[in-house]
Amino acid sequence: MRGLLKLIQCEMRKLKRKHFVSFVVFAALLFPIPFTALVLAGSVGNFTGFEAVFGLLVTMGMPIMLPAALGIIGAMLFFMERDHDTLKNLRVLPVSPLKIVTAKIAVLYILGLVFALATMLSSMAGGLIAGSELSNMGENIGIAVITALLYTTSILPVVIAIVGFNRSYIFSIILTFFYTMFDYMLAYGGMFATTDPVMKLLTNIMPAPIIYRWQASMFAEAG
């Protein structure tokens, strides 16, 4: 276990050199600005203040930002050794490939939780700007954390495909964004095409529609 923690720390140190990770966290903090503007304009129905900003972030912000960012970061993690020609160094280390892969995947989950924390903090700031109280904090923290874990899990098949194809970063970005947007559109478009058997099948297989239905049930219970 201690060896795995050291590997995770090593992978995190590698990512520190990449400015993209800092950009993702910064984007998570800035993302609530347009949603807060919508809330202040009264453009989100019966929802107001913190609940409205948080609901918009976890149902419309995280499904796009988190999988897209983690897919690209996953490609960075798995291609670093290839790009820097250090794969031969890993082969002489007394560490199994399974542990190295586990450490890289663990880093993705950690970053997903960091994104959830940034989303929570920024939605709290947006709620305070909108002049509302911070209600249902325990439930909302749970929703943010579980949503982050689910979307992190949902992007793992894409990361595996990227590693398997072993192509350039451009290919990784295109594949990640195509998957993310297709999944996102299914979550909302699928609601209006439930009679189509193909669409019904896809909305029961793809992660975003399933996560969205779970979020809707959680918000309904909280409300």
Regions found by a protein language model. Name each.
Residues M1-A28:
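Aromatic- and glycine-rich beta-strand/loop motifs that create alpha-glucan
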Residues K14, F79, L90-V92, I162-N166:
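Helix-capping/transition residues at the boundaries of transmembrane alpha-helices
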Residues V25, K88, V101, I173-I174:
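Hydrophobic/aromatic positions within or immediately flanking transmembrane alpha-helices
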Residues A27, F31-L70, T102-Y169:
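Secretory targeting signals
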Residues T36, P94, G112, M181-M185:
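Hydrophobic transmembrane alpha-helices of multi-pass small-molecule transporters
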Residues A41-V53, I173, F177-G223:
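Terminal transmembrane helical anchor/hairpin motif
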Residues M76-Y109:
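Helix-loop-helix units of permease transmembrane domains in multi-pass membrane transporters
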